[in-house]
């Protein structure tokens, strides 16, 4: 089960979290019971819909009879308007530009918060709640979708971003990759980039969007694990 509770985020209350814990406890017990390498291998459990705040505030790690062999996983797709939102809504605009030096003057698509300091604060929460207590943390997914001038609003022929400044958008994606990678590592969390063929050619192993990969590598070099 990936991102448990994801289909009903607005209603992930105590009963739902209890169900997630029961499911994960069953998983752990079943794996350990098979013996062999499974008796001691590292296992990964996910916090409620892999959300940092839910995992920090509402989640308790399941029990494992084997000490120091459980890891916790979260995902990072914040802010949603920058990483996943694909067209403007009545409640808000798509963020095409992210980071203090990447805003476009006069644009309605600049990020309004949830930038560098927010990323640091979120990973600090995971460090305090888990990594500092000896519980390994992985960021099992993180990425921000690519937008182009040719993108259309889903189900229509209308252009979604006709006025996009592609250079600044690319810089924003690269910088987001850099900041998230760096801050995850600095706060003791191991990041795994979610790549489905948009940034890499899986057939040749070459970069399709070199700037995005360069952002990851820059963040990886700058981020030093604290342990």
Can you say where each PLM-predicted feature lies in the sequence?
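Well-ordered, non-membrane alpha-helical segments in soluble/globular domains
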Residues: 20-26, 119-120, 170-178
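Active-site region of glycoside hydrolase catalytic domains
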Residues: 1-115, 124-145, 186-189
